[in-house]
Structures are given as C-alpha cells and as structure tokens.
Amino acid sequence: MNVKGRVVLSMLLVSTVMVVFWEYINSPEGSLFWIYQSKNPEVGSSAQRGWWFPSWFNNGTHSYHEEEDAIGNEKEQRKEDNRGELPLVDWFNPEKRPEVVTITRWKAPVVWEGTYNRAVLDNYYAKQKITVGLTVFAVGRYIEHYLEEFLISANTYFMVGHKVIFYIMVDDISRMPLIELGPLRSFKVFEIKSEKRWQDISMMRMKTIGEHILAHIQHEVDFLFCMDVDQVFQNNFGVETLGQSVAQLQAWWYKAHPDEFTYERRKESAAYIPFGQGDFYYHAAIFGGTPTQVLNITQECFKGILQDKENDIEAEWHDESHLNKYFLLNKPTKILSPEYCWDYHIGMSVDIRIVKIAWQKKEYNLVRNNI
C-alpha cells in the first residue's frame, strides 16, 4: 500500500474510533465521574476548576459532559414556564392513614406510606424531565465506615427512573470508593477542608452546601436533598418526597409534645425556641427542596451558627437546632414521616409500614475525632 493509501486508511480508523466513542458516552452505558479539588467554588462562575475522568461501569449513567449547556438552557426555560407542583388532591389522600398526622395546621402534607400515588407522580415528573441532586458529606473515618454502603443503597433506591446527580464531599479524594452506577446517575466529588471538631464539621456543611448551590448546583438540578452519610436506603425514596421545602420528622420525637422536644432553650442562642412554641422536631439527617429554598435554609442556619459563635455559645444540637428554628419561622411545604428515616433501636412501631431509610449504628468512638 502506498503512502497516500496508508494516510487515508489511518484517517478512516481514527474517524471510526471517534464516532464509536461519541456514541458510547452519549448512551446510557457511558458513565462519567467528576472529581474536583477546588475547596471553595467560585460563586457566580459556571466554570468549575477541576477535572473529570471516564469511569467505565457496566451499568453506567448517561454522559452529562456534553450536555451541560443544553441542561442549563432547559432549566432556565423551565423556570420561565413557571410550572407549579401537581395539585395535592391528584396524588395525596390523607384519609388513607387516619391513625397518624397526615396534614399540618398550615395544610402541608405529611407523607406516609399509603397516602400517595407514586405512579401519578412519576408520570408527572417524567414529563418534566427533572434532575434531582443529593449532597452527602464523609470526612475522616466516616468514609470507610459509611460512604460506600450509603452510595450503593442510594444508587438502588433514590429517585429510581429519574436523572440524579450525587454531590459527594470528602476530605480525601484518594479514599473515595468506586461505585457501579445505575442508569441516569452521575457523581461529582469535591474535596473539602476537614475540621478538628465533629461539631464544626456538622455545622460547616451548611456553608459548603450554600456555596455549591450558588456556584453550580442551582443550574444543574430541579430539586436537592441533603443527607447524613451514616444511614442506608432500604426501600424506594421517590418523587413523593419532592417539594419546595421538605423537612424530615425525627423518629424518636414524632409522637412527643413540643415542650418535650430537645429544642435549644437558651435565649442567648440564635436557635432559641421557647417552651409553648413549636410544631414538630425535625431531623437534620434529611432536608431538601428546590435549590433556591435549600440555599435559603443553609444560609439562614449558617447565619445563626455565626451569630452563636460571636456570642460564645453553641446550640445544643448544632446545625439541627438551627434547622428547627428555621422551620418554625418558615414552615416546610412537605414533611416526611419517620418511615423515611427510622432508627431500629426504637423497635418497630405499628405506624411504620415500610422503612425507606434506616439509621446506621452510631459508632462515635470510632469515627469522631472528639467525643
């Protein structure tokens, strides 16, 4: 074969490889896995400093790499459309669970198994082509003890059938477990600064989540959940949980009177809630909503945390105390029953039909730097 023929053949081979690769990464079998070392995302900048590399899983996710601009445009158009949520009467029937509280005094639904029609909701949100984000933090020994099981279970049960982005915050990227992703799923991993005290790790996540929402998350997802890593999904956590602002009932306190709640009772704290006030006790292990609402939650909670630091006081249950104060003043539009975050140490209540997420064993002596 002459030189010209070899050149033509080489060009054909290269073109074929490029076409095959392009088709692969734009198929459900192509998976991309982002890692970012930027500790502080540049607010207002769409360009994230970092890098991505392909991670070829058997059941990978659709590639978002070439779609980010299109997704951003689609999100903006969706905002302009100003589509509302599906009317409550179309998917929610509080009378199906008369033995528990299913409607708050401000008319927000409390979602229990049996009260919702997931098929109707899945069909509604599928037409909107929603993307749901999930943030999770794993610092220090929490990575080895909890992160892999959390991600594997979330991959199986979180928002099945809908596009999902997992935002994983770790202090050591080299210890990040590689997980086989299901269809429509992708990871974005960010390296964050570790704190000396576990209390500060817990409270600083509010600041970090807010920064990432402003920098990029608000352009990438329609709804966002923030969850603790020391829990595991056991059943479908689906679109019945989506709402403008979503709070989780704390399993140990869902039947208690507000005066029994472990609210912050010291007036000096920004999280102070006096006796005689309060609706429910909310668990900081799960909260969510639209990016705008979650941004407001995290900013207001962090503002309270900073105010407490200036006054040399720390709320009794740290970020959770501030979250409860926030939801007292800004009522959640949807509340999740304890089925969505159950502790088996309580035993099995007749109220709990299906456990969606379960607490993991709290091995604080092994995972926390200071007790």
UniProtKB/Swiss-Prot annotation:
Topological domains, Lumenal: 23-371
Pathway connected to this protein: Protein modification; protein glycosylation
InterPro entries xrefs: Glyco_trans_6, Nucleotide-diphossugar_trans
The protein's role, per its UniProt record: Synthesizes the galactose-alpha(1,3)-galactose group by catalyzing the transfer of a galactose residue, with an alpha-1,3 linkage, on terminal lactosaminide (Gal-beta-1,4-GlcNAc-R) disaccharide borne by a glycoprotein or a glycolipid. Preferentially glycosylates proteins, can synthesize galactose-alpha(1,3)-galactose on glycoproteins but cannot synthesize the glycolipid called isogloboside 3 (iGb3).
Compartment(s) where it occurs, according to its Swiss-Prot or TrEMBL record: Golgi apparatus, Golgi stack membrane
Domain of life the protein comes from: Eukaryota
Homology family: Belongs to the glycosyltransferase 6 family.
Species in which this protein is naturally found: Sus scrofa
EC number of the protein: 2.4.1.87
Binding-site list for substrate: 137-142, 228-230, 250-253, 262, 362-368
UniProt GO MF annotations: glycosyltransferase activity; metal ion binding; N-acetyllactosaminide 3-alpha-galactosyltransferase activity
Species classification: Eukaryota, Metazoa, Chordata, Craniata, Vertebrata
Topology term for the membrane: Single-pass type II membrane protein
Signal peptide: none
Domain notes: The conserved DXD motif is involved in cofactor binding. The manganese ion interacts with the beta-phosphate group of UDP and may also have a role in catalysis.
Protein name: N-acetyllactosaminide alpha-1,3-galactosyltransferase
Ranges facing Cytoplasmic side: 1-6
Record GO cellular component, one term: Golgi apparatus
Alphabetized PANTHER family for the sequence: GLYCOSYLTRANSFERASE-RELATED, N-ACETYLLACTOSAMINIDE ALPHA-1,3-GALACTOSYLTRANSFERASE
Cofactor(s) in the UniProt record: Mn(2+)
Active site positions, chain numbering: 320
Enzyme class at the top of the EC tree: transferase
